[in-house]
Amino acid sequence: MPDAVKVGFVPFSAAARGTLVVFCDDTLKFGSVTGKALGAAASTVKRAVAASQFKGKSGSALDLLAPEGLKVGRLIVIGTGKAAALKDNDIVKLGGAVAGKLSTGDSAVTVIAELPGGAMRPEQAAAVASGIRLRAYKFDRYKTKKKDDDADAANANVSIAVADVAAAKKAFAPDSHVVDGVILARELVNEPPNVLYPEEFAKRAAQLRKLGVQVEILDVKAMTRLKMGALLGVSQGSAHPGRTVIMRWNGGKRGAQPVAFVGKGVCFDTGGISIKPSASMEDMKGDMGGAACVVGLMHALAARKAKINVIGAIGLVENMPDGNAQRPGDIVTSMSGQTIEIINTDAEGRLVLADVLWYVAQKHKPKFMVDLATLTGAIMVALGTDHAGLFSNNDELAERLTAAGLSTGERVWRMPLGPEYDKQIDSQFADMKNTGSRNGGSITAAQFLQRFVDNTPWAHLDIAGTAMGAPKSDINHSWGSGYGVRLLNALVAEHYEAKK
């Protein structure tokens, strides 16, 4: 996976070189180590900060030519706001602010990991490192000519000066693997659809075998034998046959019940016969954001040797118009035996998930299942791009997901489920139809999925607004966000993973 910067840790005593980055709070105070590093130039720097009307707000940045007496060429001051009020994810954002100020010429950068109240804890220094890597990522491999501003932070070597190098490295080791998982998810979402189609996506998921993940790929023949009629109906119009990929990480006790994560992987969605408008159809390469998250999560958990058994399952298809494509009015039989009338071929993601959810629930009997899908435009109307929609049949699981969202910044908002919505997907000809009215569209989609989880505790995350194309954030300027990897890693680590 590409990395625009290299991040390491050095002791406070190490000499700064190239560009020096320091932190100050909203009172414009520096810590003692920072003051010592600035030396005789400290008073000059303080005057320059005051003269610039810099307020020290969290994430704000001031770029200065280093004054005489400093053995660096450039000085960057990053504001922390009220340092005592900073939470873990706020520290990650500070790292993002650091990366945002790096430029092509910054081959060597030293960041002093100190807040005005004292040295950052090892976990905080690790969070800064994570933020730097997340924000520095960019997807530009298909550009043959790059502008100067396309190369910001490229090839920078960032040294984070800390009180305890060994402790910082230990804290960053698992975090670094999670960042790798986020970057992998972003890479998958950003890839063009002529490169990343179902068979290729399955091959990339299979690379997790290098980390000790067991990977099983179900082809059309295997899915036909399993009677996955809902998923196969979606893929039948494409020249690229569908795949289902089952990934298993056995990091817990042998035979212990696994947890499961399921992702929608529509590698390109034209809408099928119910074809979408051409405007922005190119964005539908990202309709596999849920599957990308699951692969990124499995990478993170396996790489950091998570002490838990985990199933990751993704259904991979293309939804294309063709003489062999599924039609409105068709009735398909899902793996569960339930029949589905196709009203709109553009409501295809729920059909893919229906069979994969049922397969996982029946074969692996997980403790819980969380599915992720860029499922409905309706969730964007309701929640915009700052929260994913959360639907669940289990209050404890929903509460834990909500807490993990708050701690990581990958926020969720719980939406309702209830039998009163079922009538919208009742069919005259089959057990159900694949879409209801426009009203409550994200709810009826989740209501549909609930019919395929049996009695398993389950949560559905509608990530249509958060997985791709959202406004740039403190830690992501890429089109694909990698949303969900940090959220679900935190859920597992906090509540389900065996403690050492």
Swiss-Prot record:
Molecular function terms, GO-annotated: manganese ion binding; metalloaminopeptidase activity
Alphabetic keyword roster: Aminopeptidase, Cytoplasm, Hydrolase, Manganese, Metal-binding, Protease
Broadest EC class assigned to this enzyme: hydrolase
Residues reported in the UniProt entry to bind Mn(2+) 2: K264, D269, D287, E348
Active site: K276, R350
Gene3D superfamilies xref list: Leucine Aminopeptidase, subunit E, domain 1, Zn peptidases
Pfam families: Peptidase_M17 (PF00883), Peptidase_M17_N (PF02789)
Cofactor(s) it depends on: Mn(2+)
Manganese as UniProt keyword: yes
Catalytic activity: Release of an N-terminal amino acid, Xaa-|-Yaa-, in which Xaa is preferably Leu, but may be other amino acids including Pro although not Arg or Lys, and Yaa may be Pro. Amino acid amides and methyl esters are also readily hydrolyzed, but rates on arylamides are exceedingly low; Release of an N-terminal amino acid, preferentially leucine, but not glutamic or aspartic acids
Details of cofactor binding: Binds 2 manganese ions per subunit.
InterPro entries hit by this protein: Leucine_aapep/pepB, Macro_dom-like, Peptidase_M17_C, Peptidase_M17_leu_NH2_pept, Peptidase_M17_N
Sequence positions that bind Mn(2+) 1: D269, D346, E348
Family matches, as CDD domains: Peptidase_M17 (cd00433)
Primary residence: cytoplasm
Annotated GO biological process: proteolysis
GO CC annotation, single: cytoplasm
Protein's cellular compartments: Cytoplasm
EC number(s) per entry: 3.4.11.1, 3.4.11.10
Known role: Presumably involved in the processing and regular turnover of intracellular proteins. Catalyzes the removal of unsubstituted N-terminal amino acids from various peptides.
PANTHER family xref list: CYTOSOL AMINOPEPTIDASE, LEUCINE AMINOPEPTIDASE-RELATED
Family in the record: Belongs to the peptidase M17 family.
Protein name in the entry: Probable cytosol aminopeptidase
Organism: Rhodopseudomonas palustris (strain BisB5)
